[in-house]
Regions:
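Intracellular juxtamembrane helix-capping segments at the cytosolic ends
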Residues: 134-148
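Short amphipathic helix-loop junctions that connect adjacent transmembrane helices
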Residues: 43-66
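C-terminal ends and interior cores of transmembrane alpha-helices
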Residues: 101-122
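Glycine-rich segments within core transmembrane alpha-helices of 12-TM secondary carriers
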Residues: 78, 155-173
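Central cavity-lining transmembrane alpha-helices of secondary-active solute carriers
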Residues: 68-89, 136, 170
Length: 173
């Protein structure tokens, strides 16, 4: 009997991930990547801004005050952008299109940051802020829409999703 119970417990553990909709894992990795992007920017933005303009790893050579000002605006605007991003999703685009658009804008923003021109830097930051504004307020509600309201898997699904958020944040730090 004990052997049978052990087998059932193992079987239950290995199948838990197969019980969830496939869309959960797409959203898991999307949010992991977005949080890696956000916390990665938070980790290196000020360092890049205050680094000397020449040398092995050139930056923009800003003062610490200027760098902290931009960092503050970036952080505030990322979360403020979620308000119009959510409204546009609710009234015009829908959640799915908003998440896709947000991810696309994030990619463009990071590509623009790779170009060594100040105008591309500001454009990249702008695309990232707008991208997060579309993605962040909508992706969590998409996770919820994968499950029936009273599904026992719904809570597990959100836990898996939040694990992705934490992995992304941890990896970026």
């Amino acid at each position: 009997m004990r052997k049978n119970l052990s087998f059932q417990m193992k079987r239950k553990r290995t199948n838990i991930f197969k019980q969830h909709p496939k869309g959960l894992y797409f959203l898991f990795f999307t949010e992991l990547w977005e949080r890696f992007s956000y916390y990665g920017m938070r980790a290196i933005l000020v360092l890049f801004l205050i680094s000397e303009t020449s040398g092995e790893n050139p930056g923009l050579g800003w003062s610490k005050v200027e760098a902290i000002n931009l960092y503050s605006w970036y952080t505030a605007l990322v979360y403020f952008a979620c308000i119009p991003g959510g409204i546009i999703a609710d009234k015009v685009l829908g959640k799915i299109k908003s998440v896709i658009l947000g991810g696309f804008l994030l990619c463009i923003g990071h590509l623009l940051l790779s170009v060594d021109k100040i105008s591309f830097f500001f454009s990249g930051i702008t695309f990232i802020v707008i991208g997060i504004g579309f993605l962040k307020p909508n992706i969590s509600s998409l996770v919820g829409s994968l499950y029936k309201k009273n599904s026992t898997l719904r809570e597990q699904g959100f836990t898996i999703f939040y694990i992705g958020i934490n992995i992304g944040a941890f990896a970026a730090s």
